[in-house]
Amino acid sequence: MQPFVHLHVHSQYSILDGQASIPALVDKAIANGMRGIAITDHGNMFGIKEFFNYVEKKNGDVNGLIKSLKKELDNGETAPERRAAIPAEIEEAKKKLFIPIFGCEMYVSLGAMTEHIDKKDTGRHLVVLAKNEKGYHNLVKLVSLAWTDGFYSHPRIDKEHLEKYHEGLIICSACLGGEIPRLIQAGEIEKAREVALWFKGIWGDDYYLELQRHKATVPRANHDVYPRQVEVNEVLMRFSKELGIKLVCTNDVHF
């Protein structure tokens, strides 16, 4: 089976939206044979510490093995033949580590995040993932600014600050609530193209157009979402070919 990692996931820290606890999400991903999972709660990173601690606990045995192998490698009494074999064993052990990916589904304002002009400007969704330590620090900075300077119904960030703190981040275009999907649904295809090119111009290969397909199977579910996703996906796949932007498939996990 093709490896898959969830990159768009809401925990119970997505207030009044997500239902799953972080341990339940991690345990389910591990049970399904996944190498990692991202937590991308709406507008906040409240669950990141719990996420990190729980994954560290789940990785305890593997980390213990890696530590033991490194100690053996550093031991001057280890036989040369054994020493030569240890690096490969360490790399093999690292493959068994479950990877926590820190992220946030941010709200991006249409104008400056400090402007409180349009009450409807609660922000367009954007999935932001930390690629490395620098990205983690930039993500924390952006989320903090969204709360302290950009809050207007929701904690919002703007493109000026996204560009300023872009280093080390991976960006995904998000769900139907993202700026590009919303423009596509409104028939503003050329505007959507311009926005995609803006993101690509800053993040390059670290910018992805996000495909989702959630077909409702129960009567009380929202059956309007799936056909809209199919419509948006067709345009996103066309953009991918025309603009050279990579695609990523996600599920908008809430429970």
Features from the language model and the residues they span:
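Phosphodiester-processing cores and adjacent nucleic acid-binding clamps
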Residues: M1-F255
